[in-house]
Amino acid sequence: MNFMKFALFFSAILSFQVLCSQDYPTLRIIFTGDIMGHDSQIESALNTGTAGYDYTSCFRYLEPYLSSADITAGNLEVTLAGPPYKGYPAFSSPDELGTALHETGFDILLTANNHALDRGRAGVERTIEQLEQQGFIHTGTFKNAFTRALTYPLIVEKNGIRLAILNITYGTNGLSPEPPAIVNYLDTIQILEDLEKASGARPDFTVVTVHWGLSLIHISEPTRPY
């Protein structure tokens, strides 16, 4: 099977160390960038012997790093909307992609990005269902306002350290979510409300992940200096 190249743009490794003393807890987090699924990647994952898909080989060199953190999170920039499986411009990858991500060490998948609505409301809902069935923590898109109010901002506690995580996108390629589905957009008023709610959960750290910018560049755009 050909190795597949998943874009891990803007990857960052964050280490939170409360104090230098070993008497205090530490938390190591890895955030990766875009996990994509173009047509060539889907074709490379096809197991012709079983007619299923196997993404294991594409992550084998990353697994030692991604599994070494206390928490590993990534931007899932595809839907798991079921067949037909397609890449750009309306991404839907096989469920086996999620299986491989879980086995590689991903704990959290962030779903607010410009491809969140590639397969409409049904795609949002099925992606959420698959992530939950596969044991992921996830945030960024929601089936309805009730689940958003109940689960967002995402609160995660590990090693005695409490995190609040917000996930936002600049847009969804001109598509609007069909109610009751919700995508977190770059809305200043809503973000301030979410930050206030996060503060009420008394996190030790608040992490805000925003999906924006141009593909295939390694520096910030002039309009995105922060």
Residue ranges and their predicted role:
Residues 1-23:
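Bacterial Sec-dependent N-terminal signal peptides
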